[in-house]
């Protein structure tokens, strides 16, 4: 698999909107604040034509224009990495117009986004043999202060961090509103490691803190599946979907 070059000091970050753009609040103000942060850190910014658009259905613009923006910004030699402006609903409609064959021949470039951006991240990996980053979209970097996950995401883009880990707490309900676009994540829920079965929920016989490793999870997998119970184990770093007999 091909990996893009890391974002260098004083490098250029490109922004595209293959899904939603940052045309409405709170995303517009959050994205603008994020730009101030990146500029202060010495980065140059290259904004695609759709980043503030909202005329599309479930995406920033027409499928053709969204794909054209992505094609052009991926090919730009003066853009080091790409960050998506947001998630959305219908990025799938741009895929027929994305030139994956040409992208496959291009120098690999990091593209980061989440949710609807899976449409591109998955196909970059499977069709273009190019790695991407499932991570925060551009507007998230406008929060004050940054959550540790945002710091880590930038460290991954710059090559300063090559490992990922979980965080102690997660957000159940966000506090960001049109009136308060820069509030940080509302992390209130403690992370727990659990094993679930399709039939009766949590029933491993172990409390989350007792499951120490993936090997523990695998042992539970073998024990439970041998009893004919398909289930899913949510591990600290990965999801292991188990169906049938191991």
Features from the language model and the residues they span:
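Gly/Ser/Thr-rich loops at beta-strand to alpha-helix junctions
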Residues: 20-23, 86-91, 115-119
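ATP/NTP phosphate-donor binding region
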Residues: 1-78
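Short, acidic/small-residue loops that bind anionic groups at enzyme active sites
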Residues: 98-123, 131-138
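Conserved anion/nucleotide-ligand pocket segment
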Residues: 132-246
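Structural motif
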Residues: 81-83, 112, 232
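Short amphipathic alpha-helical segments
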Residues: 27-28, 94-97, 124-126
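Long, hydrophobic/aromatic-enriched structural stretches that serve as scaffold segments
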Residues: 75-98
């Amino acid at each position: 698999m091909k990996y893009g070059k890391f974002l260098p000091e004083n490098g250029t970050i490109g922004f595209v909107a293959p899904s939603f753009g940052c045309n409405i609040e709170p995303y517009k103000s959050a994205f603008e604040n994020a730009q101030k942060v990146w500029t202060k850190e010495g980065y140059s910014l290259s904004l695609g034509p759709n980043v503030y658009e909202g005329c599309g259905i479930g995406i920033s613009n027409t499928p053709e224009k969204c794909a054209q923006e992505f094609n052009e910004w991926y090919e730009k030699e003066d853009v080091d990495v790409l960050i998506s402006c947001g998630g959305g609903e219908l990025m799938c409609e741009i895929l027929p117009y994305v030139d994956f064959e040409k992208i496959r021949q291009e120098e690999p470039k990091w593209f980061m986004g989440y949710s609807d951006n899976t449409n591109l991240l998955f196909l970059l990996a499977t069709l273009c043999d190019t790695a991407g980053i499932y991570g925060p979209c551009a507007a998230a970097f406008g929060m004050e202060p940054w959550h540790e996950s945002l710091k880590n995401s930038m460290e991954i883009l710059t090559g300063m961090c090559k490992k990922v880990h979980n965080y102690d707490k997660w957000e159940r309900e966000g506090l960001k509103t049109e009136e308060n676009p820069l509030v940080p994540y509302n992390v209130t829920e403690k992370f727990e490691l659990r094993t679930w079965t399709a039939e009766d929920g949590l029933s491993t016989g172990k409390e989350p803190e007792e499951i120490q490793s993936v090997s523990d999870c695998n042992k539970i997998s073998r024990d439970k599946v041998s009893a004919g119970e398909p289930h899913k184990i949510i591990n600290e770093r990965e999801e292991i979907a188990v169906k049938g007999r191991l």
